[in-house]
């Protein structure tokens, strides 16, 4: 009997509080239709939420754009439904910066909780600052980043030269985040989400 109790305690200790952050700013609508960074982020967040909840973790979802929509930490099948409902109604609007979002949220997030950010990392000059502030408080952030540049290239709206410069800037930003010791998946629109993180 004592042995059994120990097993349960070990399992209990392995349960994590995981925070999913989805970038739904206006800039996440590049591409149109089912293929936008926001659509990709929502699909990926749904996949992660299901997997984490299946493993009996507590999961919270924060969608930020014009404001922050929160689905607080919980677990179970009913909670997955709440998360999926919030993701399916996410609209690309507003331009809340990551640093402000995290400043608002961190006081409510249990310390040491892993954060998973789904964002194209576009058009946000606060990203480096947001990461360093968050990491210095003992949190880890894994980033799954659908590249909006793939969509731009397909739509041929941006000339080759500016597109190349944008790619270099994106690569530099990703390298900088990785230099903080954080994992970033540079997610191409034609690959599965788990491939992105293996590459990162």
Q: What would you call each of these model-derived segments?
A:
Residues 25, 68, 94, 148, ...:
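Residue-level detector of flexible, active-site-proximal loop/helix-junction positions
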Residues 103-115, 121-200:
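Von Willebrand factor type A / integrin I
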């Amino acid at each position: 009997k004592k042995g059994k109790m120990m097993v349960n305690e070990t399992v209990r200790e392995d349960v994590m509080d995981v925070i999913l952050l989805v970038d739904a700013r206006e800039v996440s609508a590049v591409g149109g239709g089912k293929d936008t960074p926001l659509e990709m982020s929502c699909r990926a967040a749904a996949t992660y939420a299901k997997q984490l909840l299946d493993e009996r973790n507590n999961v919270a979802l924060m969608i930020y754009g014009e404001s922050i929509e929160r689905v607080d930490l919980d677990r179970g099948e009913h909670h997955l439904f709440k998360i999926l409902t919030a993701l399916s109604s996410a609209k690309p609007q507003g331009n809340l910066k990551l640093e402000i979002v995290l400043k608002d949220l961190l006081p409510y997030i249990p310390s040491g909780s892993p954060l998973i950010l789904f964002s194209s990392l576009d058009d946000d000059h606060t990203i480096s600052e947001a990461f360093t502030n968050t990491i210095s408080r003992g949190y880890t952030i894994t980033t799954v980043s659908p590249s909006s540049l793939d969509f731009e290239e397909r739509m041929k709206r941006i000339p080759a030269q500016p597109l190349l410069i944008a790619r270099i800037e994106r690569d530099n930003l990703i390298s900088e985040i990785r230099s903080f010791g954080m994992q970033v998946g540079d997610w191409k629109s034609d690959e599965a989400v788990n491939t992105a993180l293996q590459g990162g």
